[in-house]
Amino acid sequence: FLPAEGGHLDRASGRWALAESHDTIPGSLWFPETGRGVVDPLLWSTLTARVDAVRRDHPDWPIVVFCRADCWMSWNASRRLARAGVANVFWFAEGIDGWHDAGRALMQVVPETVPLARVRNAS
């Protein structure tokens, strides 16, 4: 839910062009910019489609939303998911910083690609 600092979504490919690499909690997915006060519907639909897909296969899995320590973008996104009826959503306030400070490993990640069909329909 971090911003794609210095980066942008290439709407021709659905991929993000980043200015710097990003580390996160192993096994996590990155959906940049989905916690903004006003979120791009294209980005939000990419996130919710992925949540729906995970829930079809694993209906009891929690959805844990995080960013950096005390990042309000992740709080916004977790609240939006819960208000949209997604159950078992949690905000991990300590985020990547807290995970790393606890001595846990991080891994490099790239943002989730926006499906081209959605990009073309949003143009």
Functional labels for PLM-detected ranges:
Residues 97:
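Conserved Rossmann-like nucleotide-cofactor binding loop
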